């Protein structure tokens, strides 16, 4: 297959949004398919073309859309709502420039199918425009919760705007069922994101920290400040149950996009002296942190699927979710031998930390890791693309009769 992937976040960024399409592109190239990826500018670099790895899609890096920053929060919400539901002059100008740059960089390459991530409308607008010109099907990657990215009252309107998509993909059963509400009759395929090799290497190595320090790792987003405060409050209370010697060995580590929020919350709980808080770090460094921690934790939101759990489970050290988790995630945890628990309140979290502090770290001699690599999950994605291409309803008619908005 000849495939064009469109995602506004460059794969060299340290954000999870830049990984999914790029990793699947590499997996499909290894299967013999041709894949080109259109993306946003590389961090600190202008737009252009290139590749980032030996086996990787050709990258077409577009300039970011130019939008005027509104000082008023109300006006920012209004502008965002308008941008989701209809094009404005700035959007049209960007779309024309992006189309021209993409066509110029593609040369003679003509995709049979386009796959675009929904994080904002720009990727979908470009995918729809190119699909119409080439009379090929395009697919929306609704990897996240459709309702989280669209305000109430706009969700169905935005879905109708992009109804010409031949189908959708979703990163969890939770997100798939939500997408089905707004795209009735459309095929919505479940395609989990994969786990990168550094986490498998961490599992094979086992716990090897000889420093004497024992690290509690917090990963991912913090979502609600109230939940973060409960989590850190439980840690502060638990620390008081340890001996002075054990307290001196303890470190709390966070590396992620919410580092400012975590720093402020940790200060409020008197934990800054035992905390190391930084922005996001590369995956191999994160995997090493998981390997050398006595426990990895994350904060649960009922509105999303936490793909980070799969990475933590593969790495092999104990994992605790706070203050809940979906059945879908618990089922993943049951597929491997990594210790996993859901702490639903302060007392439960303190109990889990006490048990894990007293337990021996996980060794490298254990059951084989689950098959959750990007290449493993590419099986379903490849089959879905092939089914869309073979469907009589996927191409042409929907594109030609749609009025562009």
Question: Where are the regions a protein language model picked out?
Answer:
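A charged, aromatic-enriched C-terminal amphipathic alpha-helix characteristic of glycosyltransferases
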Residues: 344-351, 357-389
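Conserved donor-binding/catalytic core segment of Leloir-type glycosyltransferases
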Residues: 4, 169, 208-226, 232-236
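Acidic anion/phosphate-binding donor-loop and adjacent secondary structure
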Residues: 63, 67, 150-152, 195-212
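Carbohydrate-associated surface elements
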Residues: 174, 194
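Membrane-proximal helix-turn-helix segments that form the acceptor-binding/catalytic region
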Residues: 23-24, 89, 122-125, 129-133, ...
